[in-house]
Amino acid sequence: MKSKVVIFDTTLRDGEQALQASLSVKEKLQIALSLEKCGIDILEIGFPVSSPGDFKSVQTISKNIKNSRICSLARCIEKDIDAAGEAMSSSDSFRIHIFLATSTLHMESKLKKNFNEIIDMAVFSVKKALRYTDDIEFSCEDATRTTMDNLCRIVETLIKSGVKTINIPDTVGYTVPNELSCIIKNLFERVPNIHKSIISVHCHDDLGMAVGNSISAIQAGARQIEGTINGIGERAGNTALEEIIMAIKVREDILSVSTNINYKEIYRTSKIVSQICNMPIPSNKAIVGSNAFAHSSGIHQDGVLKNRKNYEIMEPSSIGLKEVKLNLTSRSGRAAVKHYMDEMGYNNSDYNIDELYTAFLKLADKKGQVFDYDLEALAFINKQQDEWEYFSLKFFSVQSISNSLSTASVKLLCGKKTYTESSTTSNGPVDAIYQALNRIACFPIILQKFQLVAKGKGKDALGQVDILVEHKKRKFHGVGLATDIIEASAQAMINVLNNIWKAKQVNKKLKILKDFKKK
């Protein structure tokens, strides 16, 4: 039977330290509930003594979390431990996490204490915390730069004092996998009562090795891993929990351990943390990045279409990702283009794959990424993108008439002759201009995604707006780029409207062809 690895999440404590602004109590609770649904064992939800707001958030979360065990941080100071115990008092079971530096550097330059004093402080604090709960975790801060003799000595003493979990933090992300493995193995060999406690590791990513170090610790005997969702945290961040969790699952053949995680909640939880914390996920981020299951190379796409296991070591659905598509770019091959046409229900006899692929490559070189509706237009209208811009924005103005209301006026070229003007009042300038544009186009759409990315710095910086809308159960993309955010937003919507119009022209032509065949 595989042994369990306890997953300890510190997104709401260590992770929040990386944010430019503190989260509200409501936002923290939303993240905590998502983590609980994901099956996280331990939730470190704050540092209660640090501020009244943090104390309140720990109190609130303690009342609402039922399945995960909650935990809060405290220094080896009485008021810290009291604050932690009182803030979590409404919970049936909780953990107090105490920490104290043990490295010579920290003892001498930061704490101004010798090692005997450090041990006395640690033991006193553990006794104080045991008045509130029997679940105590102790972190030897900067453990990976602590001498092995001192580390073994304090760990043995702490376990005798009643500590159930001993955490070995790589506080500054200094260690490497083999070194951390040796530290853990040394503890198991030299500390006689080590098996009375769970050994944990808390790795930072300053050298980009947090996940690798955590894996090596598991192989050496550690049975609790601490980290954060998306790896957010102080400086370069922490161990990314979604990565360590999936590494345990995918490589259970060599790690021989398991977790209690609900894997299908990983992607959703990652997105919630990203959105609430306002920290975008890099596209190349392992497990949850937008490119994690994307394939652009023609060779890879062909291999995936034949068998996904050729280029995917896990199924996207295993983390709760429902829809995964091949990216159509200039690197895509015929197999990917044909796959998209098949997915849309077209037969080989409906179009010429050679002609379509040639036209596709020209468009991909010009546009970058090509979508399904682009392929339809190439196959059945056979014109390049710049030839089918039905809508063109000639003029727009937006005025704010109050704190929340804006009015927009637009002049839109529809086809080659018709100019139309429209104005509307709505909540915010972008919404106002979108309503004005769509009042002219008359396409029923639902905005599903609006993303703004800055390109460059200073007054000459460009704003790129990416939007995704749904029209009659089909998704359409649009991109706008301008120094003015409102203009970029308008361009993105014009892009969408042209894509919808283009799809409608395809449908009209296909209907004519279908009626002709019937005759």
UniProtKB/Swiss-Prot annotation:
Compartments it resides in: Cytoplasm
Chain positions recorded as Mn(2+) binding sites: 14, 202, 204, 238
Annotated catalysed reactions: 3-methyl-2-oxobutanoate + acetyl-CoA + H2O = (2S)-2-isopropylmalate + CoA + H(+)
SUPFAM superfamilies: 2-isopropylmalate synthase LeuA, allosteric (dimerisation) domain, Aldolase
Chain intervals for the UniProt region annotation (Regulatory domain): 392-519
Broad enzyme group: transferase
Domain Pyruvate carboxyltransferase: 5-267
Transport as UniProt keyword: no
Keywords on record: Amino-acid biosynthesis, Branched-chain amino acid biosynthesis, Cytoplasm, Leucine biosynthesis, Manganese, Metal-binding, Plasmid, Transferase
Pathway entry: Amino-acid biosynthesis; L-leucine biosynthesis; L-leucine from 3-methyl-2-oxobutanoate: step 1/4
EC id: 2.3.3.13
Record's GO cellular component terms: cytosol
A single MF term (Gene Ontology): manganese ion binding
Keyword Metal-binding among record annotations: yes
Domain of life: Bacteria
Necessary cofactors: Mn(2+)
Biological process terms in GO annotation: L-leucine biosynthetic process
Predominant location category: cytoplasm
Assembly and oligomerization: Homodimer.
NCBIfam families found in the cross-reference section: leuA_bact, PRK00915.1-1, PRK00915.1-3
Family indicated by similarity: Belongs to the alpha-IPM synthase/homocitrate synthase family. LeuA type 1 subfamily.
Biological function: Catalyzes the condensation of the acetyl group of acetyl-CoA with 3-methyl-2-oxobutanoate (2-ketoisovalerate) to form 3-carboxy-3-hydroxy-4-methylpentanoate (2-isopropylmalate).
Protein name: 2-isopropylmalate synthase
Lineage, broadest ranks: Bacteria, Pseudomonadati, Pseudomonadota, Gammaproteobacteria, Enterobacterales
